[in-house]
Amino acid sequence: MRVANRPVNWFMKWFAIMLKASIRGSAKVSRLAADVIVAGAGPAGSTAARVAAASGLSTLVIERRAHVGVPVQCGEFLPTPKEMEDLFPKCPRGSRLANVPTRFVTNRCSRVRLISPRCSQFEFNLSANVIDRAQYDSWLASEAERHGADLRLSSTVLGMKGPDEVVFSDREGTHSAKAQVIVGADGPHSRIASSLGRRYMTHLEDLSLSIQYVMTNVDLDPDEIEMYFGDRIAPGGYAWIIPKGESIANVGLGIRSQFASDRTRLKTYLDRFVQRHPVAKTRTGRAKVASSVAALIPVGGPVTKTWSENVMLAGDAAGHVMACNGGGIPTALIDGEIAGQAAAKNIFEGLPLSWYEDTWRKETGTELETALMILHLADQILPSDVLTDACMRLAGSRYLEPLIRCRLPLPVGIAANTLVRLLKPIL
């Protein structure tokens, strides 16, 4: 019996091997190679991929979402090109990168109104475009593809295997891809940064927890953005109403966990703001929630080092967010272009990737560090509504405006520190 079964056993083994081989052959190749691999197709990643591909480099983009830009996880606020010149005076590329095609602009604003805990109001000029972030991000990715980049959607970066290999998974299994240059633009959860030992998620206090509703039937001035402060509203952060267009607004807030109550849910903070704030409820009293989203925003400043021999970190993965206001689109676009150029210079000319860090520090480093200094100053003030209100009234629009623009006037720093020393012991 054993002898008679041998041909059958051999045939079954052969059939199984051939079946597995045919399955592997019908699937995508599990081992890939490119000149440049970009993890993440947000503004930083797509811009880096476009620049690299346009330089003639084979470029692979790995994006975890099925649709680029969805869900939207920001207030969709982007300063105008003119404002970019003021915000980043050492960055020659900023105004050009902020020149968004008109079809993606849903509203244009020219003023900002700040509301203190006791509802004192301060207004100043600041021009911004409110964009359709989902459509804009999708366009940025399509521009990268148009220049030759290979975009892989629904693909999750798992980490790095060695200095030049990225491991990722999709519906067909696990794959690895090798490249001469790797750009980690995969957000504050960055697996690329984690593989380098520079993961941003190590310290929760370096993150802002944010939640946002898109609301319809909002009673608003479409020309004005509103920012609300108060420990009960948004501990360690602020709330916002950003008009997307006629009667539609992004209404949200960001908090810092170390200042918040462990028992209060993030959604509870936002609902309380929408329903109870004396000023906000006049805008949102008849409004309806169309959609909601939550996100993590890195506010701990840039990671210590954003490059290694063949890896660069860009955008949120590098901590490149204006810490005092949470803005990250401008720096992501700037990072992306510099990273794409650095990849080309590295591969074609042998220039070390340290050029990437030298360049972004020159163009945006001062502003990123100043924003972090302002946040640290605010951390001493925001836990007390009395102190926050007093500081805002003392500063007035004249000095609050540069703070929102991420500049720290000397009189503000001196006055704020003096008030903190005098009032904190009795509050």
Model regions and ranges:
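Extreme N-terminal leader/targeting segments of oxidoreductases
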Residues: 5-9, 13-36, 54-55
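N-terminal Rossmann-fold NAD(P) dinucleotide-binding loop
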Residues: 45
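N-terminal FAD cofactor-binding segment of flavoenzymes
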Residues: 65-112
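C-terminal helical "tail/cap" subdomain of flavin- and related membrane-associated enzymes
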Residues: 341-427
